[in-house]
């Protein structure tokens, strides 16, 4: 993080929280999932983002890490080894247990923990977790009502079930990289871990649905959330297009989104995102731009005519927006109730007036990293607020605490540490 980025704004620091001194055992006492305990065997992005959301909602998340730690501890900007910006962003509201799961004693520790949790989440290949002895059948034998969620790359009923999967691979496989090649010579990845993050949110929904079923019936179940299938469903929600019908009148794709002119429009001093969507929007925009005749030329009152002429309309709009500044167009669009915004850079988001007003960003003191900025949970609950109670943990920060809760004696914990079955930081 650059020095300039360390300067937290006044809105953030006004309510600066000292999560560094939060008591981890008492912290998870609010939120709609308060009292729920989750055993988190995930790493990298998909699983950790999902379990962080559950933690934001009040669940007690026990993050089980290898003795080397989650891979994302080393990816991103870092002030200190093992605490990267990405790790800090997707691992708050968790307690860390560093455990050698491949050892017999480590497996015994996990078995004891399973007896006291409601949910187990992992993102290993199913064959790998089966070899460790913690496939669904083995875990359900220890805890019959557990909600067991496997985040996989590919569904286990298909021929690709054992293939490795990362975000780039899934973006390519699900059609996103192809979609993102419009106007370019080669396919390109979207510059965000969109497959990981989208599948992570799907995982949250799946876990909550399974928990609701358990609350009604008392029965746990196996839940699978495959990245590939999730992202194909995500991509085709609007892009299934002509493939919806048999025989297909056209190919896949939502035409309006695939036109080359669908991009931020140039202005005198930059660019603007403007979306005249209805016929009324387009008529008002053309009139404001001094070309009311174009509304009749393109037949904007008719949806089919708008769709047929959308590329030409985007082209004319881009020429018109060049004639005024971004601020002028924002003012015009606001008066006409046409959706529009300036182009906001990532670095400018913490100072965005709306985000400051709703308190999306928050300053906090981290036990090892000092003053940090985090993004608050965006979802609002009137009676059971989601909030940040714990900072992202150091590797093995809560090992002793978690083992004591599981019924281990101090001498047993010391023995596990000496034999490097577990490690404890701090």
What residue ranges belong to the model's regions?
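N-terminal helix-loop segment corresponding to the beta1-alpha1 unit
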Residues: 2-216, 242, 316, 394, ...
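Glycine-rich beta-alpha junction loops
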Residues: 68, 153-155, 227-232, 269-271, ...
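Short Gly/Pro-enriched turn/cap motifs at secondary-structure boundaries
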Residues: 87, 252-257, 262-264, 309, ...
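A short glycine-threonine-serine/GTX helix/turn-capping micro-motif
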Residues: 188-198, 220-222, 252-253, 260-262, ...
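Mid-domain beta-loop-alpha active-site segment that forms a flexible
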Residues: 193-208, 227-235, 277, 281
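Substrate-binding/catalytic subdomain of NAD(P)-dependent oxidoreductase enzymes
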Residues: 211-250
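Aromatic-enriched alpha-helical interface/lid elements that frame and gate functional surfaces
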Residues: 255-256, 260-336, 340
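A glycine-rich dinucleotide-binding beta-alpha-beta segment and adjacent secondary-structure elements
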Residues: 335-389
């Amino acid at each position: 993080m650059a020095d300039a980025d360390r300067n937290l704004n006044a809105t953030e620091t006004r309510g600066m929280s000292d999560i560094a001194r939060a008591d981890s055992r008492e912290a998870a006492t609010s939120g709609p999932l308060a009292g729920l305990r989750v055993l988190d065997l995930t790493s990298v992005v998909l699983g950790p983002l999902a379990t962080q959301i559950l933690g934001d909602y009040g669940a007690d998340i026990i993050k089980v890490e290898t003795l080397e730690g989650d891979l994302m501890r080393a990816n991103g900007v870092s002030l200190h080894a093992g605490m990267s910006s990405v790790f800090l962003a997707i691992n708050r509201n968790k307690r860390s247990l560093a455990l050698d799961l491949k050892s017999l004693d480590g497996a015994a520790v996990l078995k004891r923990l399973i007896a006291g949790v409601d949910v187990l989440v992992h993102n290993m290949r199913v064959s790998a977790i089966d070899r460790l002895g913690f496939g669904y059948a083995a875990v359900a034998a220890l805890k019959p009502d557990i909600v067991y969620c496997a985040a996989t790359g590919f569904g286990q009923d298909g021929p690709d079930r054992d293939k490795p999967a990362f975000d780039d691979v899934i973006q390519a496989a699900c059609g996103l990289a192809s979609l993102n090649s419009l106007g370019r010579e080669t396919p390109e990845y979207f510059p965000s871990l969109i497959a990981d993050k989208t599948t992570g949110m799907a995982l949250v929904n799946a876990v909550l649905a399974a928990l609701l079923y358990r609350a009604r019936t008392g029965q746990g179940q196996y839940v699978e959330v495959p990245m590939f299938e999730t992202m194909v469903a995500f991509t085709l929600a609007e892009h299934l297009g002509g493939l919806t019908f048999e025989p297909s009148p056209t190919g896949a794709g939502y035409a309006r989104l695939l036109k080359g002119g669908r991009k931020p429009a140039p202005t005198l001093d930059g660019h603007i995102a403007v979306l005249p969507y209805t016929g009324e929007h387009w008529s008002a925009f053309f009139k404001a731009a001094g070309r009311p005749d174009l509304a009749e030329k393109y037949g904007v009152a008719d949806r089919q005519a708008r769709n047929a002429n959308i590329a030409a309309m985007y082209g004319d709009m881009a020429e018109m927006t060049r004639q005024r500044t971004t601020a002028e167009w924002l003012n015009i669009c606001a008066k006409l109730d046409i959706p529009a915004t300036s182009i906001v850079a990532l670095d400018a988001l913490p100072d965005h007036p709306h985000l400051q007003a709703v308190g999306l960003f928050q300053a906090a003191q981290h036990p090892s990293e000092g003053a940090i900025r985090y993004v608050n949970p965006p979802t609002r609950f009137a009676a059971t607020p989601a909030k940040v109670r714990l900072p992202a943990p150091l590797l093995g920060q809560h090992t002793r605490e978690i083992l004591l809760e599981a019924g281990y004696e101090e001498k047993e914990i010391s023995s596990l540490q000496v034999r490097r079955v577990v490690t404890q930081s701090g």
